[in-house]
């Protein structure tokens, strides 16, 4: 069976989409190719790396990447994680399903905010996997 492809997109591919990619590889990795990208690149937020390390998921080697049209076209599912990405995402081919899972941006906020958003993203991906 061929793996499906899921593509997590947010504004800067810095926090939310990085955490989603980490959770996605952990939870969906057997059945899905998991990628993340941004409309812009802001670098991977060190607090996102630290937050994921706290749940034993290593995203320290992730890079902050712009949306890759080849991956976009080959995706089975594109998930936008913020309203900016939802509104400004490139045109998605008709064969690709798109969903919006909105999460607060923890950048510049308290450590507990990173933990909360990390846990919310993880919970959503677990629910997605279970369905």
From Swiss-Prot:
Pfam families: LMWPc
A GO CC annotation given for this chain: cytoplasm
Enzyme class: oxidoreductase
Active site, UniProt feature: 10, 82, 89
SMART domains: LMWPc
Signal peptide coordinates: none
Domain of life assignment: Bacteria
SUPFAM superfamilies tied to this protein: Phosphotyrosine protein phosphatases I
Molecular-function GO term, any one: protein tyrosine phosphatase activity
Main location: cytoplasm
Disulfide bonds: 10-82, 82-89
InterPro entries recorded: Arsenate_reductase_ArsC (IPR014064), Ptyr_pPase (IPR023485), Ptyr_pPase_sf (IPR036196)
GO biological process, one term: response to arsenic-containing substance
Catalytic reactions on record: arsenate + [thioredoxin]-dithiol + H(+) = arsenite + [thioredoxin]-disulfide + H2O
Family assignment from sequence similarity: Belongs to the low molecular weight phosphotyrosine protein phosphatase family. Thioredoxin-coupled ArsC subfamily.
NCBIfam families: arsC_pI258_fam, PRK13530.1
Function: Catalyzes the reduction of arsenate [As(V)] to arsenite [As(III)].
Listed name of the protein: Arsenate reductase 2
Upper taxonomic lineage: Bacteria, Bacillati, Bacillota, Bacilli, Bacillales
